[in-house]
Amino acid sequence: MDRVTRLASQKAVVVFSKSSCGMSHAVTRLLRELGVDARVVELDEEPAGADMENALAGMLLAGTAANGGGRGRGVVVPTVFIGGRLVGSTDRVMSLHVAGGLVPLLRDAGALWV
């Protein structure tokens, strides 16, 4: 978990992804189209990728439990951090975007200048 936390705080937006995941590509494309230069960590290309994936699963599980939801330990990619804080996966990022909350969050984190 330390490695995940350290990586997540190194840039305004960090996406933990897998190179073969379509949803990961969708989220990174959305961020890119908004003008965000996100750091993308491809877990399937990292030597410690499996350990990081387990850490992310635990973080997501803790986050959904704290929010009254139950996502379980299924799919963990993409997992998005903005401003060093866990935002969540595709559903959360897209919900924020549709509701108009993603851009202000990105601005507050310094990921957008406009």
Swiss-Prot record:
Belongs to the glutaredoxin family. CC-type subfamily. This is Monothiol glutaredoxin-S8. It comes from Oryza sativa subsp. japonica. It is found in: Cytoplasm. Disulfide bonds: none annotated. Transmembrane segments: none annotated. PANTHER family: GLUTAREDOXIN. GO terms for molecular function: 2 iron, 2 sulfur cluster binding; metal ion binding. Residues 1-113 form the Glutaredoxin domain. Keywords: 2Fe-2S, Cytoplasm, Iron, Iron-sulfur, Metal-binding, Redox-active center. [2Fe-2S] cluster binds at residue 21. GO terms for cellular component: cytoplasm. May only reduce GSH-thiol disulfides, but not protein disulfides. Coiled coil: none annotated. The keyword Iron-sulfur applies. It comes from the Eukaryota.
